[in-house]
């Protein structure tokens, strides 16, 4: 047992060292190129506003997404005044996502070993998984998918162990992982549903005929689903208290569903605007990033059925549940269909490849045949990597990634930093510049004087927007309406970006390489 413990720590240490250097190094390079994940930066902004705005409060989140990624960066953001890059380049998010990426790979290695792989082979397969673009890029860019993957694999590992060991303590860990997953990303609700159904069926099967069969499988379901219920209820209550809506993501114009509906024309350009086209598009994405995942999953399920091993259902419930909801959301028009949303197919397929390899390792029959088959499977996990990296450069399949590159080339963040520097140079008092941080959050993050802004999360934002002069607001900062269709300032003063709407005069303008203009208007005093 001691030897196994030392071996496990050593192998985990190799994964930790390799992935930490890889993800942090890639993160530094991406930040240096101004290739910033917009969702990652907005989550850092939520955490930043909770600490450094003129009205700091933990409910500064927009309540449109899970709060955990924003809360996780707050300890790092406390050092932002001394290390501005933590906020200005959202590098605090990169540190957190890199940590989560490292944790995810450690958990993936342990799952591969649990599925029967040897230590060295598990290291190799984990290394292949770690350099996959859908794993590496979120971990190096601050994207929340890295945190979601870590907690999903944590739940998967413990669910797989429970399916094999029937230890109720494992279900406590499963429930904890799923509850955390919901607080990262609401799509985790599908994993919760699939897991609870799986636990219900398996627990009932195990306890059938017993005197306390009913109470036992209900207890197991409570352990697996209870933390999610608590997280769901508490977050809904917090949303109600802060925004007046139980589910702000569905009610707000800034929610993903509303934004996806608004951008449907752009999505229809690549799908043809029909179900067949959408299915073809999703299939192309899936085949590009995980072309053999379906094959590995199918083979593993056949082997598991033959061996009567329910362990493979753990990844199917958690990873497969999240993936299924992502696909359904896109087909229903509630999602942008970003390439990164295919993420869960990658580890699911890799884990099932590991299961096949583990079966070959422990199997019977000619050793030469089993070794040859194992090499074929191992090579099959490696060969698709170049195709997956190519997919991230395809403007049709990887629309979000290409937008990030175009933004960097256009100098958008450099232009926004110029806006922040100019406002800082004015030495304005608190609350002098009103802006909708749904769109201007990079400017606030780049500023060394964040309290000069009146921002959307401020509890007196609406009051100051209704009467800027009385509220001692001197300027309004707005951008192109085509890129800010739900801007609160433009809604209050229609036409302000074009001509000041009769209430303000143009003070200054900044234009980036794509022609996107930021305009600073000074409110006219009576």
Predicted features by range, described:
Residues 45-46, 50, 61-85:
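Short hydrophobic/aromatic helix or loop-helix immediately within or flanking a transmembrane segment
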Residues 52-58, 217-218, 236, 240-304:
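Membrane-lumen/periplasm interface segments of multi-pass, membrane-embedded glycan/lipid transferases
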Residues 379-439:
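Membrane-embedded, lumen/periplasm-facing catalytic core of multi-pass transferases
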Residues 138-139, 145, 190, 291, ...:
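Hydrophobic/aromatic-rich transmembrane helices and adjacent perimembrane loops
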């Amino acid at each position: 047992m001691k030897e196994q413990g030392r071996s496990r720590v050593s192998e985990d240490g190799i994964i930790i060292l390799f992935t930490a250097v890889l993800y942090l190094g890639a993160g530094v390079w991406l930040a240096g190129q101004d290739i910033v994940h917009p969702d990652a930066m907005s989550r850092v902004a939520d955490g930043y506003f909770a600490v450094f705005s003129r009205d700091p409060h933990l409910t500064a989140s927009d309540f449109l997404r899970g709060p955990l990624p924003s809360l996780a960066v707050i300890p790092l953001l406390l050092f932002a005044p001394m290390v501005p890059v933590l906020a200005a380049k959202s590098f605090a998010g990169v540190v957190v996502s890199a940590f989560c990426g490292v944790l995810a790979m450690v958990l993936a290695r342990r799952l591969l070993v649990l599925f029967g792989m040897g230590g060295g082979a598990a290291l190799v397969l984990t290394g292949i998984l770690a350099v996959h673009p859908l794993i590496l890029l979120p971990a190096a860019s601050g994207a929340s998918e890295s945190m979601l993957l870590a907690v999903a694999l944590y739940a998967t590992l413990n669910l797989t162990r429970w399916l094999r060991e029937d230890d109720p303590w494992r279900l406590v860990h499963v429930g904890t992982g799923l509850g955390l997953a919901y607080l990262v990303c609401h799509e985790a609700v599908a994993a919760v549903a699939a897991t609870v159904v799986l636990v219900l069926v398996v627990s009932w099967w195990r306890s059938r005929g017993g005197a306390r069969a009913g109470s036992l499988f209900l207890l197991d379901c409570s352990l697996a689903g209870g933390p999610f219920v608590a997280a769901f209820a508490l977050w809904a209550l917090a949303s109600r208290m802060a925004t007046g809506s139980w589910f702000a993501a569905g009610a707000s114009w800034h929610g993903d569903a509303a934004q996806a509906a608004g951008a449907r024309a752009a999505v229809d350009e690549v799908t043809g605007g029909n179900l067949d086209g959408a299915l073809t598009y999703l299939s192309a994405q899936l085949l590009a990033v995980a072309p053999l995942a379906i094959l590995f999953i199918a083979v593993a399920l056949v082997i598991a059925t033959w061996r009567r091993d329910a362990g493979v259902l753990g990844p199917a419930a958690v990873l497969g549940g999240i993936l299924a909801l992502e696909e359904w959301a896109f087909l229903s028009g509630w999602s942008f269909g970003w390439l990164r949303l295919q993420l869960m197919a990658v580890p699911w397929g890799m884990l099932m490849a590991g299961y096949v390899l583990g079966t070959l390792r422990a199997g019977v029959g000619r050793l030469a045949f089993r070794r040859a088959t194992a090499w074929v499977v191992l090579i099959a996990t490696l060969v698709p990597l170049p195709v997956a990296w190519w997919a991230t450069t395809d403007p049709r399949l990887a629309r979000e990634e290409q937008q990030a590159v175009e933004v960097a080339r256009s100098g958008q963040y450099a232009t926004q930093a110029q806006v922040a520097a100019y406002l800082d140079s004015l030495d304005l008092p608190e609350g002098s510049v009103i802006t909708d941080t749904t769109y201007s959050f990079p400017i606030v993050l780049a500023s060394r004087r964040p309290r000069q802004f009146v921002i959307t999360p401020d509890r007196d934002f609406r009051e100051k927007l209704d009467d800027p002069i009385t509220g001692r607001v001197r300027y309004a900062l707005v951008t192109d309406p085509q890129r800010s269709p739900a801007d609160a300032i433009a809604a209050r003063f229609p036409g302000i970006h074009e001509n000041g709407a009769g209430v303000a005069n143009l003070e200054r303008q900044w234009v980036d390489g794509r022609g996107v203009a930021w305009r600073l208007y000074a409110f006219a005093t009576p």
